[in-house]
Regions:
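Detector for Asparagine
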Residues: 22, 45-46, 80, 86, ...
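Conserved small/polar residues in nucleotide/adenosyl-binding loops
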Residues: 2-10, 237-246
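FAD-binding beta-loop-beta segment adjacent to the flavin cofactor pocket
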Residues: 226-239
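N-terminal Rossmann-like NAD(P) cofactor-binding subdomain of oxidoreductases
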Residues: 1-4, 8-147
Length: 246
């Protein structure tokens, strides 16, 4: 098809957006939730395929969750779907751990899951990025900061639903003074599991789930798997801790 460009001063013109959306094969939405829903409402044919990066459709039963590494079934659904919701950043790390463990019966659906995560500020929005990158940024931005203390983080619904958990997890996100990257940790209490699992067994469950993946790599148990204690890659790594007595 011939390429069509939306003139900059018409990019918020509903009629122009509607015309371009319906003339496209694929539409990528990088918009706030309300604007993403509006854009989807413009579709008037059956051939347009949409990939939405917002939170708007991640738990919508009419949409496919766009995490192909989770399973062959996920890959097949994405391949055939015309509506794909891109996973959230924290949710990607959380679900990559919980989904295989729930699926394999290691993690009970009713387990009281707690997750701790630290991330850079790039996903916090334009205002936050500007504040962090300002020459005169306030002193409080120099240190890690907790947020979403009301336990109502916008990623919680997808974290629960896609992982197959009966309840929303307790989630403690922290933003720090660096641009991008995150670490998501989920401690498991062995005495609360249905039976005893060693770190090696848990690692094997994760490895079997992701052994054919190009973008998820399961590391050996222990910090020695990380050179110098740091990761400098866009890949997703998982690694169980070797503390099997808790």
């Amino acid at each position: 098809r011939q390429r069509q460009m939306c003139i900059r001063d018409r990019r918020k013109d509903p009629a122009e957006r509607k015309r371009l959306i319906n003339s496209a094969d694929f539409v990528f939405l990088c918009l706030p939730d309300a604007a993403a829903r509006e854009a989807v409402s413009f579709v008037e044919n059956n051939h347009v395929r949409i990939i939405d990066a917002s939170t708007a459709h991640r738990t919508d039963p009419g949409w496919t969750y766009g995490f192909p590494e989770l399973s062959p079934e996920h890959r097949e659904k994405i391949r055939n779907s015309k509506r794909v919701a891109n996973p959230g950043c924290y949710a990607s790390g959380f679900i990559s751990i919980c989904y295989p463990l729930v699926k394999a019966g290691v993690l009970p659906q009713f387990y009281p899951v707690f997750a701790y995560a630290t991330s850079g500020y790039s996903g916090a929005g334009k205002k936050a990025i500007a504040a962090y990158e300002s020459d005169d940024k306030p002193e409080e931005l120099l240190s890690p900061r907790q947020y979403a203390l009301d336990m109502n983080h916008k990623h919680l619904p997808e974290m629960q639903k896609i992982s197959g958990l009966a309840y929303k997890p307790m989630f403690n996100p922290i933003v720090d003074n660096y641009y991008s990257g995150m670490v998501v940790s989920i401690p498991l209490q062995g005495r609360l599991l249905q039976k005893r699992f060693t770190p090696e067994q848990i690692r094997d469950v994760l490895y079997d789930n992701y052994k054919d993946s190009n973008f998820v790599e399961v590391k050996p148990a222990g910090s020695e798997c990380v050179p110098d204690g740091f990761l400098t890659s866009c890949l997703l790594y998982t690694s169980p801790s070797p503390r099997d007595r808790q």
